[in-house]
Amino acid sequence: MAGFISNFFGVGDSDSQYEEPTEASQAAAPTESATNTRSTPKVVPMQGGKSVNSKIALFEPKIYSDVKEIATQLLKNQAVIINFDHVDDEMARRIVDFLTGTVFAINGEIERIGDEIFLCIPENYEVSGSTTSQFDTSKL
């Protein structure tokens, strides 16, 4: 019984059972380990929720029908800056009213960033900071 336990733990007389490795088995061993180290990596690139190619479109509308192109850009999830220098105040109000509805429909925001300049952003944009200057409210 003691011999069995010694053999089980590798302490006993096991010289007779040991075989010298042959050259063929030694040559085969490195190729197996080489193939194991060449396994393909399991790396998966992570895709972010926000697009890296975000764009901001600039518009200076001259007539009311220009609002259609501005709204199309917003529906494509692009931010828009609108400069109302080239339209009268009544036309600018109509365009801002239309864009307010468009921005509401896409869960975006519209912000006044200058006397006659507005920023419209879709839902996936965030604006930080604020303007400290007082705007002339009689213009729009």
UniProtKB/Swiss-Prot annotation:
Keyword list (alphabetical) reads:
Cell cycle, Cell division, Cytoplasm, Septation
Species in which this protein is naturally found: Lactiplantibacillus plantarum (strain ATCC BAA-793 / NCIMB 8826 / WCFS1)
Q: Which gene encodes it?
A: sepF
Enumerate the subcellular locations listed in this protein's record, separating them with semicolons: Cytoplasm
Q: Which family does it belong to?
A: Belongs to the SepF family.
Relate the assembly described in the record. Answer: Homodimer. Interacts with FtsZ.
Tell me where on the tree of life, at the top rank, the source sits.
Answer: Bacteria
Name of a matching Pfam family: SepF
Outline what the protein does: Cell division protein that is part of the divisome complex and is recruited early to the Z-ring. Probably stimulates Z-ring formation, perhaps through the cross-linking of FtsZ protofilaments. Its function overlaps with FtsA.
Primary subcellular site in the record, as a coarse category = cytoplasm
List the transmembrane segments: none
Quote the HAMAP family the UniProt record gives: SepF
Q: Which InterPro entries does the UniProt entry name for this protein?
A: Cell_div_SepF, Cell_div_SepF/SepF-rel, SepF-like_sf
Region called Disordered, residue ranges: 15-47
Which GO BP terms sit in this record? division septum assembly; FtsZ-dependent cytokinesis
What Gene Ontology terms describe where this protein resides (cellular component)?
Answer: cytoplasm
Q: What name appears for this protein in its UniProt entry? A: Cell division protein SepF
